Amino acid sequence: MTGEQSCSLDTAGTPEQRLGVLGCTVVPGERRCSALTGGWSDGAGRTWTGPLAVLADHVLGEVANRPQAAGFQPVTTALSLDVLVPPPWPGDRLHARAARTAGEVLRDHVTASVRDPDGRLVAVASAWTADVPAPGTTPLAAGPAVGARPGQGEIGELLTDLTEVGSGPDEAVLELDATGWTNQNGTVHGGVWACVAELAATRLTGSAPHAVNRLQLAFLRPGRGRVRLTATALHRGRTSGLVEVRGRDATGRVCVHAMVGSRADHAAPGAVATLSPAGRNAPPPAR
């Protein structure tokens, strides 16, 4: 199916489309997918990294979305994203390419690269996927081509569905009504988990100009309905930061474990002034 658009996106309303992801192109040995980045800004001059994980999660998952045995469906069990060039990026879209790197029966490892319109590598991603039993379901098939331009302000829609339950110097808690942010299996989309993990983690960076450069997520069990994410600061230094995020369902079970890494954004206004002379482990200035 060289050059054809074919992927599992529905024609409207999916988290991927709401966050700018367009349909996939199938070429020998890989999938290619683009995303419009105009809706990744919160309206306050900040472009978020999390939606990049939605693009990565989608194109990586499509590689694994091959014909399944009856009674099985593919799921992503782990997702890793390294941002090599922080936003904002030139142009209005990014382009991803993904391919299978290794695998065995019912399990695959896939990798992806993401480039800007000038061909510059801005991010790399990888995922582990697995085929899991799904009694009573039919194998997933490629859906219709998706080419409609998504609306703008998508990250704002996600922010609207978030509630800040509590926050302090070392912990932040957010709740998400995930009803409208599910994948085709009816569970919280992996890229959406990444978005909210980033949003929770940034509550703990204070005024230090850190840019998220690494997202690692382990998907332990499906999440549905209203979910709660608790972010805990592990390190906030002059050059890097690390925040642990745990996502739970309404019963309190951990569905997702995430690590959000950041590095000092020396291009940000006042970056040098906010670097603490006390050493790597000094906290950022008070908000």
What are these regions (language model features)?
Residues 30-32, 78, 93-95, 109, ...:
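Intrinsic-disorder/low-complexity, polar/charged segments enriched in Ser/Thr/Lys/Arg/Asp/Glu/Gln
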Residues 61-95, 100, 200-228:
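Hydrophobic beta-strand-centered segment that forms part of the acyl-chain substrate-binding groove
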Residues 172-239, 243-256:
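Structured core of small recognition/catalytic domains
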Residues 35-37, 83, 176-178, 219, ...:
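Hydrophobic residues in beta-strands and at strand termini
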Residues 62, 87-90, 99-152, 221-226, ...:
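HotDog/MaoC-like acyl-thioester-processing domains
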Residues 18, 31-64, 68, 175-202, ...:
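Hot-dog-fold acyl-thioester-processing enzymes
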Residues 1-40, 127-180, 273-287:
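Non-catalytic linker/capping segments at the edges of enzyme domains
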Residues 26, 56, 81, 108-110, ...:
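Structured N-terminal alpha/beta-domain signature
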